[in-house]
């Protein structure tokens, strides 16, 4: 797991530990999922870790919440606290999960009620809650201006996802079983610079202890640039592509390719300025291959509980009541 989480250019759906790879993607094609973008999985990647010294690890990346704009405030793109996000591993080749990592998210306001500012004339002020994610600059060394935070816990389920034995994943970096998710990228005034945000976000990479595993893994959940490449508008406009290469070779600039063709360019990628929310796990190979042949299959799912009752007088943490059995609403592998 590279500390900057740079992605391979080829989308990888299933990774064998011998590097046999295939590709897949989903960007909101299922009609019902458009009503719940927070549980919409856009891509799933699995590959051998390529950071120096990490050759004995596999990285699994599940991306959620498609088509995020950097200016998508004031609420930005929180994960759904009523959902169950899962990464499943099949290490016996029977298309049934043997290991599942379940993620549950929680939200909180600063001090329980959020930051309040005194509004009004002197002697007649009223404390008014601020409806913003932050009220000042944010950095690794000073997060006092953060007004909204997300945390998450992880459970490892062995066997059947719904009925198997579950154990908490331990946070080796800071202790306990809770992990923090950084704010989305709000802007350079908030974080000082692009580099300032990178430093801030990287501080949320955690070492994790896996039950029964001699080596630690790592986890990271945060907003990242969407690594997928596609011309979405032309695709859904009756596959309205012009010939891709207008030159005899990419970059030749001689116009001797397809008549009316275009030179390959990142400007044709309509996701180049879009973000997603990444759930990334880096796991020791020895602890996930089981007794199979050393090859794994993997997928991600998101589930919601069946009954939901909306609160007619909602508060921050009580907008609805959820209960009952979990139902899979999103799947990608």
Where are these predicted regions, by residue range?
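Surface-exposed extracytoplasmic segments
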Residues: 23-333
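Gram-negative bacterial Sec-dependent N-terminal signal peptides
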Residues: 2-23
């Amino acid at each position: 797991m590279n500390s900057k989480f740079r992605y391979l250019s080829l989308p990888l759906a299933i990774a064998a530990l011998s590097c046999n790879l295939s590709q897949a993607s989903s960007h909101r094609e299922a009609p019902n999922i458009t009503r719940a973008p927070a549980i919409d999985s856009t891509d799933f990647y699995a590959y051998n870790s390529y950071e120096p010294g990490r050759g004995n690890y596999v990285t699994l990346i599940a991306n959620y919440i498609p088509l995020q704009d950097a200016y998508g405030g004031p609420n930005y793109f929180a994960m759904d606290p009523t959902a169950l996000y899962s990464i499943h591993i099949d290490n016996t080749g029977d298309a049934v999960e043997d290991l599942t990592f379940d993620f549950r998210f929680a939200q909180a306001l600063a001090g329980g009620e959020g930051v309040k500012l005194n509004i009004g004339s002197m002697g007649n002020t009223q404390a008014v809650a601020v409806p913003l994610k932050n009220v000042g600059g944010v950095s690794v060394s000073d997060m006092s201006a953060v007004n909204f935070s997300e945390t998450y816990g992880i459970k490892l389920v062995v066997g059947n996802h719904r009925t198997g034995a579950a154990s908490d994943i331990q946070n080796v970096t800071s202790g306990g079983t809770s992990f923090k998710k950084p704010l989305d990228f709000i802007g350079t005034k908030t974080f000082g610079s692009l580099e300032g945000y990178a430093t801030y976000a990287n501080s949320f990479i955690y070492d994790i202890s896996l039950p029964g595993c001699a080596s630690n893994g790592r986890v990271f959940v945060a907003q990242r640039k969407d690594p997928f490449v596609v011309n979405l508008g032309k695709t859904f406009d009756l596959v309205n592509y012009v010939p891709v290469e207008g030159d005899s070779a990419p970059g030749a600039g001689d116009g001797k390719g397809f008549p009316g063709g275009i030179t390959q360019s990142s400007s044709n990628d309509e996701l180049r300025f879009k973000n997603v929310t990444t759930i990334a796990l880096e796991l020791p190979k020895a602890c996930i291959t089981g007794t199979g042949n050393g090859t794994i299959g993997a997928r991600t799912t998101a589930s919601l509980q069946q009954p939901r009752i909306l609160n007619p007088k909602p508060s921050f943490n009580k907008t609805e009541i959820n209960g009952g059995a979990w139902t899979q609403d999103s799947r990608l592998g």
